[in-house]
Each structure stands twice: as C-alpha cells, then as structure tokens.
Amino acid sequence: IQAYFAATHEKDITLSPEAEQVAWKEKAKVTEAEIKQIKAAMRGKKGDELAAYEKQLEEATNKLPAPLPALYSVENDFKRATPIHLLERGEYTKPKDKVGARPLGVLLPDGAPERESLPENPRTKLAEWIVTPDNPLTARVMANRIWYWYFGRGIVATPNDFGKMGLRPTNPELLDWLANQFVAGGWQMKPMHRLLLHSSTWKQAYNSPAFEANMAKDPENKLLWHSSRRRLEAEEMRDSMLAVAGRLNLKMGGPSIMVPVDKELTSLLYNPKQWTIAADASEHNRRSLYLIAKRNLRLPMMDAFDAPDMQISCARRESSTHAPQALELTNGDFASAMAEAFAARLTKEAGTDPKRLTERAWQLATGRSPNAKEAALAAQYLSGNRPLREFALAVLNLNSFAYVE
C-alpha cells in the first residue's frame, strides 16, 4: 500500500499575489535570522540570564509573519519516489526485499503479481481498486459503520476487524443488502442515513409488548427487537449540560479551544505554557467539537466518560460505569459550574414557585414533564429551603438526562 504513495510529495498552492509572497519571505528571513542568533547566544546560559534569552526568543518568535493563505496540495514526482521495502520486525533500519505497488496480499488471490513500476496516477489507481465491484469489503465496512452510528452496535460488532479474529455478522444478508444499497446509491452517505432513519428498526421503542419472551431469546438485543438504551457520550454529556444551563456557545468555525484545567494537569506537559487558555471566557462554552485534543492532557470530563485517548484508532466507543463518573457529575468543577448556571436560569424563568421550578427543570433537562412520583420528590426537596443549586445538580444527574431510550 505504501508504494502507491511513494512518489507523492506536498506542494501547497499559495493564494497570495507574488509581491505579497516576496514581502512575506523577506520579513520571515529577517526574523528567522534573529531567532537563530538568540538561540546561539543562549547556549550554556543558566538562571536569570537564560530566562532573559528565553523571553527574547519568545518575543522574536511572535514577530514571525502569519502563514499566507494556501491550499493543501500534493503532486507526483516519480524521480523522488521513495523505495519501499519489507522491514524485518517492522524496523526501518533493517530493510529486506523491495516491494512494488499492490493492494494487501491477504485481500488478493494467491499468486497475484507485484507491479514492477508505479502506475501513472498511483493514488487514483488505489482509489479505483478500493471501490471496484471485485472488492466488496469496502462497502460492507462502511455500511456496517453507518449502522453502528445509529444503533450502537454494528451488524459486525468489531468495526475495525472483518477478518478471522473479528466477530461474525449477526445478520449477513442484511449487511450485504446495505452494502449493495450503498454502492447503488453512488457511495453517497445521505441516502444511507435516510434509509436507516425511515426504517422500522430505528422507530422502535425501548419497551416491547413481548419484552420478557424476547429477552429470554436475545438478551443482548443483537437482532434489535427493541431500541437500545444508551448513555450520552462524553461530548454529548458536556454539550447537554451547557445547553440546559443556558451557557452553550453555538459559534461556528475557528481554531480549537483550550479551556481552564487544574494546574496539576498542565504541569504534566513538557512545556506547560503550551496550554494557552482562550482569553474570551465565552469561548470556553463552545461545543465539545471545538475543544482541543491532546494525547498527553486528558480533560477530566472527557476521560471519565470514555472519550478516545487518541493513542490508537477507536472504531467503537466503550461505555463503562465506574465511581469517577459519579464524582465528576457531583463534585467536578464543570458540573458544579453548570449547576450554578442552571439554578440561575430556573430562578429567572420560573421564579420561586416549587411547582413551576420543577416543571421547567424537567422540561429543560429531559424534554418532558415530571411524573407524579418525580413531582412529589421535587416538591418535598424544594419545601426544605435547600439551595436551588443542589436541586439543579440533582436534575443533571437524573437517568432521564444522562441516558437516551
């Protein structure tokens, strides 16, 4: 596979006029020379003298001109093609036989020949092989992933492994049919989303008339005879708490955001100054999509609720249950701040009447009115003149808030 990319090299296309590019290069050249001079002067320095040079280096680095707008692009340069070899035990310092461009041998018939030279458009040829009708694996894998996104479990429960070490499909005929639909639809995902959302399987409720009988036959719900109950994922949990508290910033686009964290976490970084908190506090309440993700600094909320750690590919998220989750939702800094904001919102929108407070809290957090038992418990709690913040925190810990049925 790597041989298909052996001749590929970056060639970004700068969008600025030539005169602007020349001016940018001149300014960058002067600043880079200054940085080089400071680095040479600070060698061997210690203490206050070193700190002074570090400050100069930071100031000089900040003077570097911002990158010019450009389009990321690549080109094929066969004269610079990198030779690809088999590696002994995967070590690049121990190359063995040279190999040509060819799909993975495990996916090809026995005796399939190597390609001696690169094709004219190697990446295009690889893409064509990936979607050829002779390779049904791609469509099956993609259809299975789309199914997993909606139902929490793929028809093949190991989305990254369709081989002998993976689990067998629970409904192979359905998987083949979905794969054929995907290909027939021009490999477009929107028709697949529409197909699944209009299906009777998607429209099922959690409670089934034959719940006990079906549970005896299929307790893991592999055949999806009812909808599966699932907990909100880490990002969904955070965004939902922000929305209920009235703090969610729906701003679109822009760079990733660094939010405030404990100093104990930033001190673990090689350079703690890398964690630059956004100056505008409203940016801290952006959707979790915009939170910066660092492998060596895990946000407590994300870590507790099984967000991927980005060390390895994550085809399927697990949903664990452990004590730190309860601690995060009751004593965590983020949960406490959201409870305060939620209580302030309830006071503003529902006043001090216990019945109105309860109704508004349930509507915001669960999308429904409280049942008789819930209303009675809430009324009993609020009649004790306890802090409204504690009531708001309890509502944010309801199963009806944290789980989707």
What are these regions (language model features)?
Residues 6, 91, 294:
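Residues that form or immediately flank small-molecule/cofactor binding pockets and catalytic motifs
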Residues 1-36, 302, 314:
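Sequence context surrounding c-type heme c attachment/ligation sites in exported
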Residues 292-298:
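Hydrophobic/basic alpha-helical segments
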Residues 289-290, 307-308:
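C-terminal, charged and often intrinsically disordered regions of DNA end-processing helicases
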Residues 28-283, 302, 308-320, 330-389, ...:
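Primarily short, surface-exposed interaction patches in extracytoplasmic proteins
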